[in-house]
A protein has these predicted regions:
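Solvent-exposed serine/threonine-rich low-complexity stretches and specific carbohydrate-binding patches
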Residues: 835-845
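Exposed aromatic-hydrophobic patches
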Residues: 202-204, 708-713, 852-860
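Short proline/glycine-enriched turn/loop motifs at strand-loop junctions of beta-rich domains
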Residues: 125-127, 689-695, 798-801, 819
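Aromatic, loop-rich ligand-recognition surfaces of beta-strand-rich domains
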Residues: 773-837, 851-901
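Accessory carbohydrate-recognition regions in carbohydrate-active enzymes
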Residues: 1-320, 324-368, 374-423, 431-457, ...
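Extracellular Ig-like/FN3 beta-sandwich strand-entry sites
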Residues: 212, 715-719, 865
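Short, compositionally stereotyped local motifs that mark structural "simplifiers"
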Residues: 656-783, 787-789
Length: 901
């Protein structure tokens, strides 16, 4: 049950290795974050047993084809058909789950094959037994269908929307005894065929005390015929036989790594971790090879197994490197799946789920998986096609890639999470370069090697942190502990060491081994407190290291690169011993589809892949006396606590890094230093760079470039383009910055307090004449939570004014709602204010699309005023329909520009 409590988000039900079916109880139907797997150990009510579940994700989905046994009069209200249960009557082992439903005294036993879920219900009381099929369980039902074949067999179709926007599941449900339909909820066709977006049926029969009823549910992603064919996996009704076969599959699978250990807790932690790495990705094709592609069409099998559920932002780090050791064939199948998704969906997967691209998280980390496999000599897929697909992902123009290609980094002006995206794109580009090198593609190799050094463009040599840039300069104020929209689920501490492709270059940028060691020490020894946005994923803090989320996972191993392996071992063992427990809350963060557990498996073995794409394992000290790795080819290798040795068929800790050649090297872009993005009369600026010998060249408003000898002064709105020359014929990419001369000399006194994450450049940002876009994550909006907004604009002298406007943004999914109303007041002395007007909001708070609204008023005749007060009333507590209601969430006001004429 490790990970079923706390924030682990694992499920306890039955499945087989990499199986299509995950048959597990559901205790959460509210879409809550800690209920992403459908189950949480703190709960006391089971609502049903569904056949698909996600292991440790941070988004909710699945829960398909839910069945629930009850007794008495059937009811379709989950609160009525749900049943209390006790953990003392619950058992979960590999391939088997059982529980007693207290409400009607029913014993439930579950097991599976790859594509079939097998239920055994024991009704301990005589009477009317029901099996509820509720297709509205958890996800939004787009299209439901139930076809009655006979009293023992039905076909089911469930097309649903949640995280995956258009998911298809087909099922064949078989009962070992005939049932009658006793109740129906249906808003569509009725008869032998039931359809609709509200669909539930109750199947009923009389039972004797102690009577067993068996149910088989076969899944298919392609159609009813696929489900019929897949049902051949389980012939007959011998539940114990199927349970034993599932257990045998797990025995074989888990014996791929054998450890010698007497501590039962450590054994349970290790093998549960190994188990968690093997419950996904999931086979997503029928027994005859047919599968549903990313184009939503059904395709014939092509000689490999097609899979789904690729949490690549997480799993490229440790789970997929682990698979290269013990799942070489599946690794090739995963990659062949990637390539089919590229062919049928237009690009490689980012976070694929049930033939849907969710576009969750960042990077194009499928290239890491492919490069790692190629580096380690894994075959069974087309290297040339893999390279073409990888290059395609890197050359797209979305998600900040256009700016990244143009200027060598992503700015806040271009895209949110700009720092994280720049760093992860750079690593992925290095992976593509390694693929090009294997295929002797010299030009591609040099191009992507140069791109892989783009991390240098966001590294601040003064502070030693990866920092966001805005308008060509460093964004400020800057706090490396602050979690904000410039980083993906983290802060600068947790991203400033992510240069796995160029660790020697990173160490050099920090000032050498000693300074790099000091920086690592500072991270681990800092106060374990973050600032800015509350981020539920950032857990397991050691200083600012956060083991509960993936960006930190390689950091403890960086001491190895500066000759301090004892510090690596110390940190790794602390994490192993403190953040993994044999308890339901035994994971310090989300399991994340096996990544959290893969870190444990590899680290406890004394190895880790810091740089996937490089045929190299980094050592630490193993925690077990003996570790035997059994490979697919029948060979095995023995590792020991004292020494891993070079027995895994690839190099160990050689650090054979090759410094980029001049043709591959990158000259970092210069940084522009200016007081702000806007100015009243004139503004000066200067350039700076890590290399103090760099020369700078600039162009103002598309004039010829010229060398900068001294600082410049602007006195009108201007766009500056600039680059640096390192003196050896290597120039940087060209960066542009635009500075605006303000349309007036107004000043503003903001009475409210904005959230530091959403400062929009400070108070002057509200009267600078620059309007924000609907992508508020770029940082152009000021945010105020749990308070009204109030500010006074000083026009500097009494003027005739007749036009008043203030601009607000709504993104209700992010708790940003329009103010209920905006009031405008006038004054000549800043003491006595007269209400001019009140503008009511007319934007529906339930509207999903990001929306901008000007709360404007035009007076019928001019008003004499020097001071204009603007007051916007906060929406307040999030309403009951809102996803943040259960968190007692308070709405934000987002404002950008106040205009007075």
């Amino acid at each position: 049950m490790i990970g079923t409590g706390g924030h682990g988000h694992t499920y306890p039900g039955a499945t087989v290795p990499f199986g299509m079916v995950q048959l597990s109880p559901d205790t959460r139907i509210d879409g809550s974050w800690d209920g992403c797997s459908g189950y949480h150990h703190d709960d006391s009510v089971i609502y049903g047993f569904s056949h698909t579940h996600l292991n440790g994700t941070g988004c909710t989905d699945y829960g398909d084809i839910m069945l629930m046994p009850t007794m008495g009069e059937p009811n379709f209200d989950p609160k009525e058909y749900g049943s209390k249960f006790s953990h003392s009557n619950e058992k979960a082992t590999a391939g088997f789950y059982s529980v007693k439903l207290d409400k009607h005294n029913i014993d439930v036993n579950l097991t599976t094959s790859t594509r079939v879920g097998f239920h055994q219900y024991v009704f301990n009381n005589a009477g009317q037994a029901n099996i509820i099929l509720d297709l509205n369980h958890r996800d939004k039902l787009l299209e439901g269908e139930v076809r009655i074949i006979d009293q023992k067999r039905i076909w089911v179709k469930r097309r649903s929307e949640a995280w995956a926007k258009d998911q298809y599941v087909f099922a064949l449900i078989e009962f070992d005894k005939p049932f009658e339909i006793s109740k129906v909820k249906c808003n569509g066709e009725k008869g032998r065929r039931f359809t609709g977006t509200e669909l539930a049926l109750s199947f009923t029969r009389k039972v004797k005390k102690g009577e067993k009823i068996l149910v088989k549910v076969t899944l298919s992603p392609t159609g009813f015929e696929g489900a019929e064919n897949n049902s051949s996996e389980i012939k007959g009704w011998d539940f114990n036989k199927v349970k034993k076969e599932a257990e045998q599959l797990w025995d074989k699978q888990l014996s791929k790594i054998e450890i010698t250990e007497t501590d039962k807790d450590k054994l349970a932690i290790f093998y549960t971790a190994l188990y968690h790495t093997m419950v996904q990705p999931n086979i997503a094709q029928d027994i005859d090879g047919k599968y549903r592609g990313r184009d939503n069409k059904v395709h014939d099998g092509e000689g490999f197994d097609y899979y789904s559920v690729f949490s690549l932002w997480d799993t490229f780090r440790a789970a997929h490197p682990l698979y290269t050791l013990i799942e070489k064939k599946r690794t090739a199948d995963f990659i062949n799946t990637f390539l089919k998704q590229y062919e049928q969906g237009g690009r490689l997967p980012v976070w694929e789920l049930a033939s849907n691209e969710t576009d969750c998280m960042i990077g194009y980390h499928s290239v890491s998986v492919m490069a790692d496999a190629m580096a380690k000599g894994i075959t069974g897929f087309d290297y040339e096609k893999a390279f073409a697909a990888a290059k395609h992902s890197a050359m797209l123009d979305h998600l900040g890639l256009d700016a990244y290609k143009r200027q060598g980094f992503i700015s806040m002006d271009d895209e949110h999470e700009s720092v994280s995206k720049t760093l992860e794109y750079a690593y992925d580009d290095w992976c593509i370069a390694q693929m090009a090198q294997i295929l002797n593609k010299k030009e591609d190799y040099e191009y992507f090697m140069k791109r892989s050094q783009s991390w240098k463009n966001i590294f601040d040599w003064e502070t030693g942190f990866m920092r966001p840039k805005k308008n060509g300069g460093w964004d400020k104020p800057f706090d490396p502990r602050e979690i904000n929209n410039n980083y993906t689920e983290g802060n600068s501490w947790q991203y400033s060491f992510f240069v796995p492709q160029d660790i020697p270059g990173m160490i050099e940028a920090y000032g050498g081994n000693d300074k790099f060691e000091a920086k690592l020490d500072e991270m681990f020894n800092s106060e374990s407190k973050t600032t800015g946005r509350e981020q539920v994923d950032v857990t397991g803090l050691i200083g600012q290291y956060a083991h509960g989320n993936e960006p930190s996972h390689h950091m403890a191993y960086l001491y190895n690169y500066i000759g301090k392996p004892e510090k690596t071992t110390d940190k790794v063992h602390y994490i192993l011993n403190n953040f993994y427990k044999n308890t339901p809350d035994g994971l310090i963060g989300n399991e994340d589809c096996g990544q959290m557990s893969a870190w444990y498996v590899l680290s406890s073995m004394g190895i880790y892949s810091v740089t996937p794409g490089k045929a190299e394992w980094i050592e630490s000290k193993a925690t077990f006396d003996k570790i035997k790795v059994n490979f697919e080819n029948g060979e095995s290798e023995l590792l020991s606590k004292n020494s891993v040795k070079n027995r895994l068929g690839i190099s160990m800790t050689k650090y054979n890094w090759i410094k980029p050649k001049l043709s591959e090297s990158l000259t970092p872009v210069p940084v522009i230093y200016a007081e702000s993005k806007s100015f009243k009369n004139k503004m000066g600026f200067v350039f700076d760079s890590f290399n103090k010998d760099t020369e700078y060249f600039y162009s103002i408003n598309n004039k010829e470039f010229e060398k900068l000898d001294i600082g410049l002064v602007l006195n009108e709105t201007s766009t500056i383009k600039f680059y640096s020359d390192n003196g050896y014929g290597k120039v940087s990419d060209t960066v542009s910055a635009t500075f605006f001369k303000k349309p007036n000399n107004y000043t503003i006194d903001i009475k409210s307090t904005y959230n530091p994450q959403y400062h929009a450049g400070g108070k002057e940002g509200l009267i600078d004449g620059i309007n924000g876009s609907t992508n508020w994550r770029k940082g152009d909006w000021q945010g105020y939570q749990s308070q009204d907004f109030e500010a006074i604009v000083d026009l500097q002298n009494v003027k005739e004014v007749s036009s008043f406007s203030s601009t607000f943004l709504q993104d209700q999914r992010s708790w940003i709602l329009m103010p209920t109303k905006v009031e405008y007041y006038s004054s000549t002395d800043n003491i006595n204010f007269i209400l001019i007007t009140s503008v009511e909001n007319d934007v529906d708070p339930k509207k999903d699309e990001n929306t901008i609204k000007d709360f404007s008023f035009k007076a019928s005749k001019p008003i004499n005023a020097r001071y204009i007060k603007v007051k916007a009333y906060n929406f307040g507590r999030l309403p009951e329909w809102h996803i943040g209601y259960h968190d007692k969430g308070e709405a934000f006001i987002f404002i950008d520009e106040i205009t007075i004429k």
